[in-house]
Amino acid sequence: MAANLLFSEDQIKEYKTKFDAFDRNNDGNFPTMFLGNAMKSVGHVLTAAELENSRRVRKGTTTFPQFLAMILDKKCRKVFKAMDKDDKDKLLSADEVRQAMLSFDRQITEDKIKEMIEKADFPNDGKCSLEEFVKMVMNFC
């Protein structure tokens, strides 16, 4: 799972503890109606639209892998916005993508970053949109 490469073991344990607080039946999921509070417990606020979409997609429950994916999605968006220095075109250059990936994982190699960028095949003149960045990170293994 990509989360193991992008979150430290301590972070995963912390997120699991937060998740377990909402998994009151100890059955590996919690009702999606608690997702907003669960995300807030790890420092992320979901918009009303994100909550509504999650309720539709998750069909009533949220598992730990889904919870980690939502945290990762929020983290990707935060990193993207921090790295998009000019904020005019809402795109990251290859160098900004490299810096963003290093902010996720200090152990990642330049070769791995280059490979990821090449595989992502950004259609915007070699630049990466927010959606492309999130997809690239989610596929990172």
From Swiss-Prot:
Keywords: Calcium, Metal-binding, Repeat. GO terms for cellular component: cytoplasm. One of its GO terms (molecular function) is enzyme regulator activity. Ca(2+) 2 binds at residues 84, 86, 90, 95. Found in cell lineages giving rise to the aboral ectoderm, a squamous epithelium covering the surface of the late stage embryo and larva. Pfam families: EF-hand_7. GO terms for biological process: microtubule cytoskeleton organization. Calcium-binding protein involved in larval development and metamorphosis. Likely to function as calcium buffers mediating the transport of calcium from the sea water to the blastocoel where calcium is required for skeleton formation. This is Calcium-binding protein SPEC 2D. It comes from Strongylocentrotus purpuratus.
